[in-house]
Amino acid sequence: MTHLPKLAIVGRPNVGKSALFNRICKQKIAIVDEAEGITRDRLYAEGELFGLHFQVIDTGGINARSKEVFNEEIKRQAEIAIEEADTIVQVVDAHVGLTELDKEVARVLLRTKKPVCLAVNKIDNLSQTSLMHQFHSLGIKQMIPVSAAQGWQIAELLETAFEKISREIESQETFSSIKVAIVGRANVGKSSLVNYLLDEDRCIVSPIPGTTRDSVDISFTHKDECYTLIDTAGIRRKRAEHEVVDKFAAIRTERAIERADLCVLMLDVQEGITAQDKKIANTIEEAGQGCIILLNKWDLVQGFRMEHCLQNLEEEVPFLRHCPKIFTSAKTGRNIDKLFPLIQEVYANSQKRITTHQLNKFIGEALQKNHPPMIQGKRLRIYYMAQVAVKPPKFILFVNYPNLMTDTYKKYLYNQFREAYAFTGVPILIHLKGKTKKDKPVSSLSLTRKQTKSTDQENNEYDELYQEQRVSDEDYYFENEEDLTEK
């Protein structure tokens, strides 16, 4: 597995650590705000400088005097980052000047005997470098003036930080990992799950909602398979969105869902299905993501009955009926061993392809079992079906007139398709396409016999057809059996 050199960014609160982290990573990962204590967990991302790839770790502000409820946890997270880092950058604020907290942080870093570089932040040009002199007393020999906001001197800072780090740490081995977003409303146990899976306190765990504010990416290996867990900030009720940070965190959670390969939706069975749970479930569905549902804390409910919980879940979020469910306790690890096989299964299903030959055989058998009904003397005719995309699996069903497809028959086809191909944990998108000049009417019952060309030839021809045809007013689609709408 790749072992990249690690750079930890540390310092007192509100000196620009997260802004520097984002600048090095060249993307907005950490939430940046003027308020103190925004970053709480350790954030990891990959950076690159002149061909050298490395990991960057953003930490919360170290403040021994703070009364902030999470201060001890933030400090511990920073200490863990310092321990695992190969090189360290302490960030200070040139305009605020040297503070006692800066001195305390420097003393801690120098005791590690690791390479330490001082980033004197908020210096926009060389004319302001005189502001650096006050920091010489910290005892850190390597000092670089930088502007995280403007991107000035960032390359020079990184060169200095990695000057004494051997490139032998870095392996050129590449690997692909399955990105799994751990999502759910605030305080359902997401960080407890991540910490149990990793067997370390990577994320701050607290009964106070909103503990995790950033989306924390964590890469690791389990049974020779590579995974990246994305521990997201819980989406809270709207009344809490007066905090700008919580609003940013909710947006970051939605982005995490979009960039993940699949999602693990955590629910608290003690409180049942809430409006926030439904909102997150809808976000997963709209993103077309595969999903596994973890029903957490069921061991804390007296007289708990699984069948009642599953029935309630199906009634509240019927569009996730296809998703596998696990009753678990993230705190004790009960049934967590079932999660990884399901991740592999759902991920494989999201990329599964079915040949046009197999799909047309399926359509022929479905039509033989149950013919479409007559509508005003006309009957729906299905010409053929083909898959056009994966993640999520997407299919086009070519018919004579889409408006002849009744709701009952839509449900029938959907259920038959699920029964034939399962696609456990993955949404299925099936689009209806109206008749075009290129479609020759054929008997719907002859679909299983019309095999005059190879499957590969059919797939190539149909792929070209989809690219040429434009979506018309007659196009319809349905996602799962209950969500068929006109486009």
From Swiss-Prot:
User: For binding GTP 1, which residues are annotated in this chain's numbering?
Assistant: 11-18, 58-62, 121-124
Q: Which residues form the KH-like domain?
A: 352-439
Could you tell me which NCBIfam families the record lists for this protein? GTPase_EngA (TIGR03594), small_GTP (TIGR00231)
Q: What does this protein do?
A: GTPase that plays an essential role in the late steps of ribosome biogenesis.
* Complex and partners: Associates with the 50S ribosomal subunit.
Q: Which UniProt keywords apply?
A: GTP-binding, Nucleotide-binding, Repeat, Ribosome biogenesis
Q: Example GO molecular function term?
A: ribosome binding
**Where does the record place the region Disordered?**
441-466
One GO biological process term: ribosome biogenesis
Listed InterPro entries: G_ENGA, GTP-bd, GTPase_Der, KH_dom-like, KH_dom-like_a/b, P-loop_NTPase, Small_GTP-bd
Q: Where is the EngA-type G domain?
A: 5-169, 178-351
> Nuclease as a keyword?
no
Which family does the entry's similarity section mention?
Belongs to the TRAFAC class TrmE-Era-EngA-EngB-Septin-like GTPase superfamily. EngA (Der) GTPase family.
Recorded name of the encoding gene: der
CDD domains noted in UniProt: EngA1, EngA2
Protein's name according to its UniProt entry:
GTPase Der
Quick one: which residues bind GTP 2? 184-191, 231-235, 296-299
Q: Which domain of life is it from?
A: Bacteria
